[in-house]
Amino acid sequence: MTNAIFQTPVCQLKELNNLFIELTSKNCNQRCKHCYIDFPLNKNVKDFISVDTIKKALTDTKNEKIKCIYLTGAEPMTHPDFNAILRMCLKRSNVCIFTNSTFINEKKVRFLKRVEDESDFEIIFKLSIDHYDEVKNDDIRGRGAYRQVLHAIKSLIKYGFNPILCITNYYNEDTNVLLTKFRDICKKIDFHAKYNNF
């Protein structure tokens, strides 16, 4: 066996049009089987990015044409200052929230819609779901995760949001079958999903 080191090419950006902010790298209320995050044994670890760091990132990129700010993490909505961060980012551009949807309920969605309406920009939701079968999905994400995502989708649609589903084909199933089954579920909850990443 030969050891080798490969260097990836450096690409010069002509402009910065997307800004990714990882609000937390360790705080999540799910323990998905496929997750890359090495969660600490101590569940009290708080590794939230500071609001000042986010302000600095927004200031440092003020001359860039940012089209979207992506709030990621483990679970970004666990950040204690999430609402303030969202408002701050919405002053600058569209905001996309990558979430497992466990913090999304009708009360939260009403609040988020009000925040979006106060802004010139849009909030985009990317919701994680890994299987069309409740038992298989919850085997990956934890009990109740499947129903929570469906509830979140319904609440978001009710208030005019159009969530994007992020699906991991954990069981390596036929993609066409997977998509057909998800389409059937989406129809049942009156969510008209389009597929553009398969």
Pin down the residues of each PLM region.
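A short, N-terminal amphipathic alpha-helix
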Residues: 56-64
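Canonical Radical SAM [4Fe-4S] cluster-binding loop centered on the CxxxCxxC motif
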Residues: 10-52
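Canonical radical SAM enzyme core domain
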Residues: 42-56, 74-118, 125, 129-135, ...
